[in-house]
Regions:
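Rhodanese-like catalytic fold shared by cysteine-dependent sulfurtransferases
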Residues: 2-6, 10-13, 22-65, 74-106, ...
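Structural scaffold elements adjacent to functional motifs in cytosolic proteins
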Residues: 67-69
Length: 150
């Protein structure tokens, strides 16, 4: 009888230790804050350089600048900045190093209104590109300014 009592006690103690180990503690790192697309763009804007449409146009007139349109191909076909290169936002990380191998290239990124451009510019900087700017207002602002389009 004593033997069964000890066994029962040992089992209860063992289960107590196991279950006690399943609880969370305050020492564990807090889960990262969930962010919306708007939050991600706002965070990216803090880490990139943005230029106005007129500044971007001045860059287009200079040699040595690459305009990177990060919209989808069907958007690009409907009109784009002259001589712009199209690399959709979703393929940027997998494609850009083949199309723009020199990390010192002067790059002006744009999308339709600015969100994808900000994210793309931030990604390029994180990938080691040193001279990246996002065109504030994107394609909509370029078109509204009456600048040339292809």
């Amino acid at each position: 009888m004593k033997r069964y009592a000890r066994l029962a006690m040992a089992l209860m103690l063992g289960f107590g230790l196991i279950l006690g180990g399943c609880t969370t503690t305050q020492n564990q790192a807090a889960a990262p804050k969930e962010m919306t697309a708007k939050d991600l763009v706002a965070e990216a804007k803090k880490n990139i350089c943005e230029v106005s449409v007129s500044e971007a146009k001045a860059s287009l007139d200079k040699a040595g600048y690459v305009f990177l349109d990060c919209r989808e191909p069907k958007e690009f076909k409907m009109g784009h900045v002259p001589s712009a290169m199209n690399i959709p936002r979703g393929l940027l990380e997998f494609t850009v190093d083949k199309k723009i191998p020199d990390k010192n290239t002067n790059i002006v990124v744009y999308c339709k209104v600015g969100g994808r451009g900000c994210l793309s510019a931030c990604t390029l900087c994180r990938m080691g590109y040193k001279n990246v700017k996002n065109m504030a207002g994107g394609w909509v602002a370029w078109e509204k300014a009456g600048y040339p389009i292809e």
